[in-house]
Amino acid sequence: MDKSLFEQARPILEQIQDNGFEAYYVGGSVRDYVMGRNIHDIDITTSATPDEIESIFSHTIPVGKEHGTINVVFNDENYEVTTFRAEEDYVDHRRPSGVTFVRDLYEDLQRRDFTMNAIAMDTANKLYDYFDGQQDINNRIIRTVGIAEERFQEDALRMIRCLRFQSQLSFDIATETFEAMRTQMADIKFLSIERIVIELTKLMRGINVEKSFNHLKSLKAFNYMPYFEHLDMNQINVTEPIDLELLIAIVSVKFDINYSLKPLKLSNRQVKDINQYIQIMNALPSIITKEQLKMFVYDYDTNLIKNVMVAADVLKANDIQGHEPLIVNLQTIDETLHRLPMHNRKDMMVNGGVLMAHLNAKSGPWLKDLLRQIEIAIVTGKVSNEETEILKWVDNHVKI
């Protein structure tokens, strides 16, 4: 088990303790330590207030000081150090109206979401587990700390996080926790879609995504999410991990819709990937010749092509026609990509200026069409990517 990240952070805890305060590792890192999983991020909780943390360390960043969180920069790494706190009443099912700093570890841990995330550990690797988190981990159960309805009323995102953890960890959800989700799922409509998308992205990549996705449907979670709320998501099936962007593309192809993606507030890159996924899925079934395969590999991101091909079972489960394996497979994609004479239009040895000068013509719609014709001719091997050869080909094959 890799404990090196704990060791790297140990001097921070020791320095806090040397100044008379308590300090512990907490949250996901401790959960993963107990499970024997790789540890990625270290979170630290302490009885010291933010002001006291800033006085102890020379290099700090007040990233969320009003909520008790200070980033301590140590050996060029950022560590989140958060003061023990009790939270006041929540507003809009998503954030506390205020926080009160406390000096008691138990009081801090009891406000956390799930028992598996409410375990603290000191520098001697002693665990502080007031809510039987280790027992739930051993039994592979996700259970809220305390009363489930109260935890979900505080922050409705915890319901989506619960399903995300189920997908990632292949845990079951405690009956009382699941029933509270059933009665309170409508509260996710109060959340920002950005927070939901972050959780869905992780959920869709989890090893147990099929079960969690089915729970999203049975709990009617999609009814309260922008974009998805207008669709019958019960018709969508996910049988293995895929990107969220691919899911959205599958939905678009399955229902033959062209809804705006703006309600999901995705990045430009995500929108671009979704549109490419749609084009790839529409193009795949019609590829029957080597020339078509060359243009297909040239026109689209090969990583996205491979993602679609690997997800063939998901496409089939949604009645979307896939590729012809004898013509299009991972090997032929790689071989075709390797043999392409160029990989984008910037590699082409002529441009619009050269063509206008050669043909003594002004710019117009013809130019875009001609550049595409040349592109196709080069990629499919009809002409070599050399200026003189291209211009000869233009003279012999093109009329404007």
From Swiss-Prot:
Function: Catalyzes the addition and repair of the essential 3'-terminal CCA sequence in tRNAs without using a nucleic acid template. Adds these three nucleotides in the order of C, C, and A to the tRNA nucleotide-73, using CTP and ATP as substrates and producing inorganic pyrophosphate. tRNA 3'-terminal CCA addition is required both for tRNA processing and repair. Also involved in tRNA surveillance by mediating tandem CCA addition to generate a CCACCA at the 3' terminus of unstable tRNAs. While stable tRNAs receive only 3'-terminal CCA, unstable tRNAs are marked with CCACCA and rapidly degraded.
NCBIfam families to which the protein is assigned, alphabetical: PRK13299.1
An annotated GO BP: RNA repair
Record: residues binding CTP: G28, R31, R112, D155, R158, R161, R164
EC number: 2.7.7.72
GO molecular function, one term: magnesium ion binding
Keyword entries, A-Z: ATP-binding, Magnesium, Metal-binding, Nucleotide-binding, Nucleotidyltransferase, RNA repair, RNA-binding, Transferase, tRNA processing
Further remark: A single active site specifically recognizes both ATP and CTP and is responsible for their addition.
Residues engaged in binding Mg(2+): D41, D43
Pfam families: PolyA_pol (PF01743), PolyA_pol_RNAbd (PF12627), tRNA_NucTran2_2 (PF13735)
Residues the entry annotates as binding ATP: G28, R31, R112, D155, R158, R161, R164
Species in which this protein is naturally found: Staphylococcus aureus (strain MRSA252)
Gene: cca
Keyword Ribonucleoprotein: no
Protein name: CCA-adding enzyme
Taxonomic superkingdom: Bacteria
Reaction(s) catalysed by this chain's protein: a tRNA precursor + 2 CTP + ATP = a tRNA with a 3' CCA end + 3 diphosphate; a tRNA with a 3' CCA end + 2 CTP + ATP = a tRNA with a 3' CCACCA end + 3 diphosphate
Required cofactor(s): Mg(2+)
Oligomeric form and interacting partners: Homodimer.
UniProt record similarity statement: Belongs to the tRNA nucleotidyltransferase/poly(A) polymerase family. Bacterial CCA-adding enzyme type 3 subfamily.
